[in-house]
Amino acid sequence: MKVISSIQELRDQLRGQNRTAFVPTMGNLHEGHLSLMRLARQHGDPVVASIFVNRLQFGPNEDFDKYPRTLQDDIEKLQKENVYVLFAPTERDMYPEPQEYRVLPPDDLGGILEGEFRPGFFAGVCTVVTKLMSCVQPRVAVFGKKDYQQLMIVRRMCQQLALPVDIIAAETVRDEDGLALSSRNRYLTTDERKEAPELAKTLQRVRDGVLGGERDLGKLEQTARTHLAERGWAPDYISIRRRANLIAPSAAELEAGEPLVVLAAAKLGATRLIDNLEI
């Protein structure tokens, strides 16, 4: 596996490749990330991964400086997955001058849920993903469903900008107790780690309620928020939305069996966790 930081060297290395499968990451890789590499291999060859902690998608009070950086461990894991190239640029490589041009998602998708609680987050994501796509020029790119809203925004962005890349969705990988794998799980204390699977269990109860015929979605959402709050969580949102566009479903759509997803974000101690479950 080649480890490359220069955009020009990356382009030289990939020249002539027309089936490249790309997996962008911020590093601190876990089994969820590695499953993306394996899925990428099913859809293209060679597989290219990137590791770049993107300052643009962190808010002023977020964890950019303490975000785990484990490059050597990550390299070893990617080598075992037979990744062809790891693109690991520095900030100077990616942003040699102030990034004044940004890619802004529409408010109807980028300003809700995560976008409401993390202003500017999706503009940072869209900008860096567009730039990475320009560098790698893949045929397919793989994103995890754990970041459901991000997946939808990136997919729509590629369609709207006519980027010649297919976005592949990968299922969320969970620990044995149901907790969705995340680089931020390492921030949890021992007691918090024991409590953390309750987020997934709460989403499962919401899902069961909808499938059981409950049509008062607001009641289901409020019950779930209250349940987590009583256990010491600080929920940002628990919301049932249409899978197609993350808009709240109408009563008619509910009766017609509209495909739904319940999404959640909540703080447990100092750690903010997100999860979702399709219904």
From Swiss-Prot:
MF GO annotations: ATP binding; pantoate-beta-alanine ligase activity
Further information: The reaction proceeds by a bi uni uni bi ping pong mechanism.
Residues annotated as the enzyme's active site: H33 (proton donor)
InterPro entries given in the database record: Cyt_trans-like, Pantoate_ligase, Pantoate_ligase_C, Rossmann-like_a/b/a_fold
Keywords, alphabetical: ATP-binding, Cytoplasm, Ligase, Nucleotide-binding, Pantothenate biosynthesis
Transmembrane segments: none
Name this polypeptide is given: Pantothenate synthetase
Its EC number(s): 6.3.2.1
